[in-house]
Amino acid sequence: MWGNDRFVTAVDDLVIVGIACGPYMKRGDGHIKQEDLHWLRSTLKEKVKGGKRVVSFNHDPLMKDLDNYIDYVKVLEKYPIVAHVNGHYHKYEYYKGGDIDCMMVRSLDKKKGDYGYTIMDVTADSVLFYNKQLEKEPVKVNAFAIDTQITPIQETYNTTFNTPAGYSIEKIYTDSASIFPRL
């Protein structure tokens, strides 16, 4: 859409940001690459100032479908996050990702003959979602009050490794490809 698999744009007081999420291996879970999380951290730090609020987009929901969703939530919860929007299940459903208000939305071709899209309206205090089928009027499917007072997520990963004597583990983030380049 914006020529990259990461995007950021500003509309009024909103910083709208999105990043790709795998799977990067055949039949793997959804995954956000470390370089994308790094980009998200630095982008939000640079862009979210002076009363700006954040709307986040990606494909997978902020739950266990995304193997490192906790890392993503930990970045977002540092900012006044209005909502996270995702697809994946091709249906409308409100849920919480950590303490972040999230909304799953439809696909373009939800079911045969039901072509359309989602309209999201962000006001000063609310977020409203509408199902817009082609050649029909939008229908409100969900709305919620904006609450940017986020309680930090408490869930953690086990990051300890049994390293054999004489070896070390070092994280290196050099991959810039957005897909697994070979199978």
Give a label for each model feature.
Residues 179-183:
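Aromatic/hydrophobic beta-strand junction motif of beta-rich domains
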Residues 67-71, 87:
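Short, conserved clusters of charged catalytic residues that mark active-site
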Residues 9, 93, 97-176:
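Binuclear metal-dependent phosphoesterase catalytic core
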Residues 21-22, 59-61, 108, 134:
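Active-site beta-loop-alpha junctions enriched in small/polar residues
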Residues 62-67, 110-112:
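Acidic-and-aromatic substrate-binding clefts and catalytic sites of carbohydrate-active enzymes
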Residues 1-45, 49-50, 71-83, 93-106, ...:
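Extended active-site neighborhood of metal-dependent phosphoesterases/phosphodiesterases
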Residues 44-64:
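Short acidic, glycine-rich surface-loop motifs adjacent to enzyme active sites
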Residues 56-61, 82-92:
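Histidine-centered catalytic micro-motifs
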